[in-house]
Regions:
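A SIS-like phosphosugar-recognition module
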Residues: 1-304
Length: 304
């Protein structure tokens, strides 16, 4: 989303474990970006080697200096998030989003897609993110209260559109990793193709309903997302909506509203994921789960 929007370059996204087995079409004019917190992830490393073998340049986004992936890449963007002890990634994921935004911004500038004024505006928005994250973190007591009300649920559904859909996937992953609750991330626009059948009065549905009023596409997706919330409510689902501050339209139709500071559309995911991480944390604690060392999982997956 970020690179296509800011640099107007076509982008494909794939799992490292799937990439090498589909015989990808690559060449010297293709850049393969590999993302790994540890830099030792077996599937990602194998995907990088496959890309290099086919003549593609590789760029690593990694947290660990000197790791295998960084040594084999043509270039590296280090996230410098510091050691991440818990198995479930939190700050590393957030810093990866930031690194991808900076990469997209750089590509947009060098390709002449972004003018100087737009670039400066986006940089200023990025510089505001730490303070806005502090605001999100200050709402932690609310996330704890939400967890108290929801920790007995057996299933969760996370919905998002556009750039917010990957955050729905990540939010669902965090919850299932550390609380052992079945959770599914889904494109909000696909609800009629299956997920609607799951909705009842016992299903919490987390909906990413933020918006950037300055972006026409954001406003359109927002209106469609509000419609999705109304669909869930019509089926008696429990809606937890993540909304931007000052927005009462989505908040009014939801059961619970998590407010985050306003930002430009492509930076909203960085602010959205933190409440979902904290909600997963508090639910896991309520359920008596080991948040740092979830069962059957390892921090660095070094075997296929």
């Amino acid at each position: 989303f970020m690179i296509e929007k800011l640099a107007r370059m076509p982008v494909e996204v794939d799992y490292g474990s799937e990439f090498r087995y589909r015989d990808p079409i690559l060449g010297s004019d293709t850049l393969t970006v590999v993302i790994s917190q540890s830099g030792e992830t077996a599937d990602t490393l194998a995907a990088q080697r496959e890309a290099k073998q086919k003549g593609s340049k590789t760029l690593a986004i990694c947290n660990v200096v000197g790791s295998m992936i960084t040594r084999e890449a043509a270039g590296t963007i280090y996230t410098h998030a510091g050691p991440e002890i818990g198995v479930a990634s939190t700050k590393a994921f957030t810093s990866q989003l930031t690194a991808l935004f900076i990469l997209a911004l750089y590509l947009g500038q060098t390709r002449g897609v972004l003018d100087e004024a737009t670039s400066r505006c986006l940089v200023q928005e990025l510089l505001h993110i730490p303070a806005r994250l502090e605001t999100v973190l200050s709402h932690d007591p609310m996330f704890e209260e939400l967890a108290r009300q929801l920790f007995r649920a057996t299933d969760f559904l996370f919905l998002g559109r556009g750039v917010h859909f990957p955050i729905a996937l990540e939010g669902a992953l965090k919850l299932k990793e550390i609380s052992y609750i079945h959770a599914e991330g889904y494109p909000a626009g696909e609800m009629k193709h299956g997920p609607n059948a799951l909705i009842d009065e016992e299903l919490p549905v987390v909906v990413l309903a933020t918006r950037d009023p300055s972006q026409p596409e954001s406003r359109i997706l927002y209106e469609k997302t509000v419609s999705n919330i109304q669909e869930v409510k019509a089926r008696e689902g429990i809606v937890i909506a993540v909304v931007t501050e000052g927005d009462d339209e989505a908040a009014r139709v939801a059961d619970h509203a998590i407010q985050i500071p306003a930002s430009t559309e492509l930076l909203l995911p960085i602010l959205e994921i933190v409440p979902l991480q904290l909600l997963a944390y508090h639910i896991a604690v309520r359920r008596g789960c080991d948040v740092d060392q979830p069962r059957n999982l390892a921090k660095s997956v070094t075997v296929e």
